[in-house]
């Protein structure tokens, strides 16, 4: 039997992915201070951040649950790009991304509080960016959307206008690779499809 799933994230996009897949869950953000963890390696960074978020939430549970933590960054030209701190930086990054290919990394952490088991993995998706004009970039930043997204774009929102194509898991670019999460659940002896019955 599948224990209750707790999503340790404030991300509306991650919530929507789970909801669309018919997976019941509850949200409990970790409010973890991401500045505590630093790394120049995107794989290490997203896995450590996802794990830290999941650990904070797992420690607060009083019943057996599965805690899912996630964190995403865009890796472009040797630079790790998380959420931009302000509109000016968002514009700079979007200009930098024009016509480039970036890699979107998402760390996935899964904690089974009943078995006291922890898994951490990552997914990577290549993102091929379009060449928006300065005017289009300013209009996009003015919507506020890129200020809430790793890498300054939301492929499931207005930012989709500026992505030519991707190679890899689409959900990963949104914030959660459901195929990877399914495999992680299986590794712990659970099936996400049990949530459908």
From Swiss-Prot:
Catalytic activity annotation: a ribonucleoside 5'-triphosphate + H2O = a ribonucleoside 5'-phosphate + diphosphate + H(+); a 2'-deoxyribonucleoside 5'-triphosphate + H2O = a 2'-deoxyribonucleoside 5'-phosphate + diphosphate + H(+)
GO function term, MF aspect, one: nucleoside triphosphate diphosphatase activity
BP terms from Gene Ontology: nucleotide metabolic process
Compartments, as annotated in UniProt: Cytoplasm
Pfam families (UniProt xref): Maf (PF02545)
Primary residence: cytoplasm
Cofactor(s) listed in the protein's UniProt record: a divalent metal cation
EC number in record: 3.6.1.9
InterPro entries to which the protein is assigned, alphabetical: ITPase-like_fam, Maf-like
GO CC annotation terms, alphabetical: cytoplasm
Active-site feature positions: 71
Gene3D superfamilies: 3.90.950.10
CDD domains in alphabetical order: Maf (cd00555)
Top-rank lineage group of the source organism: Bacteria
Keywords: Cytoplasm, Hydrolase, Nucleotide metabolism
Assigned protein family: Belongs to the Maf family.
Job description of the protein: Nucleoside triphosphate pyrophosphatase. May have a dual role in cell division arrest and in preventing the incorporation of modified nucleotides into cellular nucleic acids.
PANTHER family: BIFUNCTIONAL DTTP/UTP PYROPHOSPHATASE/METHYLTRANSFERASE PROTEIN-RELATED, BIFUNCTIONAL DTTP_UTP PYROPHOSPHATASE_METHYLTRANSFERASE PROTEIN-RELATED
Protein name: Nucleoside triphosphate pyrophosphatase
């Amino acid at each position: 039997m599948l224990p209750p799933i707790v999503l340790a994230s404030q991300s509306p996009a991650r919530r929507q992915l789970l909801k669309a897949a018919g997976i019941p869950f509850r949200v409990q953000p970790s409010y973890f201070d991401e500045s505590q963890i630093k790394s120049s390696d995107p794989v290490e960074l997203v896995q450590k951040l996802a794990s830290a978020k999941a650990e904070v939430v797992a420690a607060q549970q009083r019943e057996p649950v599965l805690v899912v933590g996630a964190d995403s960054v865009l890796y472009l030209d040797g630079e790790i790009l998380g959420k931009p701190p302000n509109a000016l930086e968002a514009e700079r990054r979007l200009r930098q991304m024009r016509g480039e290919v970036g890699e979107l990394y998402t760390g996935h952490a899964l904690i089974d509080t009943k078995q006291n088991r922890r898994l951490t993995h990552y997914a990577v998706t290549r993102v091929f960016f379009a060449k928006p004009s300065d005017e289009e970039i300013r209009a996009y930043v003015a919507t506020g959307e890129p200020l809430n997204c790793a890498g300054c774009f939301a492929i499931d929102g207005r930012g989709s206008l500026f992505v030519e194509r991707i190679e890899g898991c689409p959900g990963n670019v949104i914030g959660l690779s459901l195929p990877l999460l399914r495999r992680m659940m299986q590794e712990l002896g659970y099936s996400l499809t049990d949530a459908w019955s």
